[in-house]
Regions:
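Short, conserved beta-strand element in jelly-roll/cupin
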Residues: 39, 55-73
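Short acidic-glycine-tyrosine-enriched beta hairpin
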Residues: 75-94
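Ligand-binding loop in jelly-roll beta-barrel domains
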Residues: 92-117
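Short beta-strand segments in beta-sandwich/barrel cores
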Residues: 44-45, 69-74, 97
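Short beta-strand segments
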Residues: 35, 79-81, 106
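Glyoxalase I/VOC metalloenzyme domain signal
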Residues: 11, 41-43, 112-119
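A short, N-terminal "cap"/entry segment at the start of jelly-roll beta-barrel domains
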Residues: 1-38, 46-47
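Catalytic core of non-heme Fe(II) oxygenases with the double-stranded beta-helix
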Residues: 28, 43-58
Length: 119
């Protein structure tokens, strides 16, 4: 199968999903989805996305590049860590996350974006 070149821009996302204190900009490119999450200070998955997901923890696995801000991630087993700009995280399902500090968090997500915050 031959692929054709594609060039897309998050400023002209194929789909935008908004939720309290955040949004997901989704691109359909190369036969896959890639998302940019922008999360405002005060955002927390268990408060702002849990009602949409209907699960106690985020069940979407993620493979993310962290562009801006600090995101604290807490796994189901209670372990937690902070993800900061320049880092890459691979998260299995079963986690909560929240913005730490006054700077918005921006992440680019290759795995969990297609179903994220989908009502």
């Amino acid at each position: 199968m031959l692929f054709r070149s594609e060039h897309k821009d998050f400023a002209k996302a194929d789909e935008v999903r908004t939720f309290p204190n955040g949004q997901l900009e989704l691109l359909h490119v190369g036969g896959s989805d890639i998302g940019r999450l922008i999360l405002q200070p005060g955002w927390r998955w268990s408060e702002h996305v849990k009602p949409l997901a209907g699960t106690d923890l985020c069940e979407a696995p993620h493979f993310q590049y962290h562009v801006a801000g600090t995101l604290r991630i807490q796994m189901a087993d209670g372990t937690s860590f902070d993800a900061v700009p320049g880092q890459v995280t691979a998260l299995p399902s079963g986690h909560d996350a929240w913005v730490v500090g006054d700077e918005p968090v921006v992440v680019v997500d290759w795995w969990g974006a297609s179903n994220y915050a989908k009502s």
